[in-house]
Amino acid sequence: MHQILRTSFVLAAFAAPLAAQTPNANCSGRSTATQDACEKATDLFSFIMPQLGTSLAGGSHTLGLGSTLGGLGHFAIAARINAIRGDVPALGSLNVGAQGRSSSNIETNSQFLGLPAVDFALGIFKGLPLGITRIGGVDLIGSASYMPEVATDDVTLTPADGGLKIGLGARVGLLEQSLLVPGVSFSYLVRDLPVTSLAASAGNADFAISDFSLKTTSWRLAAQKNLLLFQFAAGYGQDTYTSEAEIDIDITSPVPVSFATSVGQEMKRTTMYGSFGLNLLIAKIVAEVGQVSGGEVATYNAFAEAANKSRLYGSVGVRVSF
C-alpha cells in the first residue's frame, strides 16, 4: 500500500486537469520548460488514481453480508485485507524534458496493491413482515481506514488528525434472509482516505503536496444465502472516486524552474463480486473476489495497459456478528 500511495503522491506533484487523448489544454498555457512535466504527470496521476480508489472502495460494503442484520441488538464487525492486481509506473526510468511536451512510452510494473480495513454494521430497524421474510430493514454501516506516518530517505508522508478516517452509510433490506429466502439489500457508503501532506524527491524534481484527499462514494445491490456451514454472497454496484491536491514543485534540471498548481480527478467505475464464507460458531472466515471496469481516462503518453483497464481485486478476512 505504501508503494501505491507514494507513487500517486509523486505523480500528483506535476498534475493538471485531464484532457482527452490530445495535449492537455491547461498544460499548453505553461512555459516550454514545464509542459512535458505537466503532460506526463497528468497522465501518470490519471493512471494510478483509479487503482488507489479501487483498493479503498472495491468489493462488498460489509465483508460477506448481503442481507440486513435484523434490527436493534444485532451487529457485525469484520477485519479484512483488500488487494488489487495493479500496475505501478516505473518512475526511476521516467525523464522529464524541458523543450516542450513529448509523448513517451511509460513503463509499468505489475504487482498486487493492498489496503487493510475494518467494516462494521449495526441493526437499526428489523423491517416489516412479508410472509416468511421481512422487507424494509435498515442497518447503519461503516468502515475505518488508517494511514500511518511514513518517513524514508526520499519521502515523508504525514496524515492529518492522526491518520484514521471513518466512513458511514446505510443498508436497506429488500428481502431479509430466512430459511428459504435469500437476503437481498441495497446499500450506500461514503469512504475517504485521511487528508495527507507529502514532501518528496523524484528524479530531477523536488515537491511538496498539501491537502491531498481521496473521497469515494459507492452503492451496492447484494444478495446472501447461508447453507449450514457455508455462506455465499454476490453483489453489483458503482464506485465514484474524487481526488484533489495542492502542489508546489521545483524542477532542478536540465532547466531549473518552479511552479504550483491544483490537481483533481473524478471517475465512475462499475464493480461486481462474489464471496464464499465458512461459518465457525460466531466467526466467519470470508474470501471475496471481484472485478472493476468502465470509466473514461484519456492519456497523451502511452502505457502498456489502459488507465481504465478492467482489474481484478480480492479480499480475505474474518467477520463476527450477532
List each model region and its residues.
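Transmembrane beta-barrel domains of Gram-negative outer membranes and organellar outer membranes
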Residues: 21-163, 175
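Membrane-embedded beta-strand positions of outer-membrane beta-barrel proteins
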Residues: 75-79, 120, 140-144, 170, ...
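Transmembrane beta-strands of outer-membrane beta-barrel pores
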Residues: 81-85, 124, 144-150, 174, ...
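Outer-membrane beta-barrel translocator domains and adjoining extracellular loop/strand segments
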Residues: 89-94, 147-159, 195-205, 243-253, ...
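Repeated loop/turn-to-beta-strand initiation elements of outer-membrane beta-barrel proteins
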Residues: 127-130, 138, 177-181, 229-232, ...
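Detector for outer-membrane/organellar transmembrane beta-barrel domains
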Residues: 179-268, 273
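Outer-membrane beta-barrel "beta-signal"
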Residues: 276, 309-322
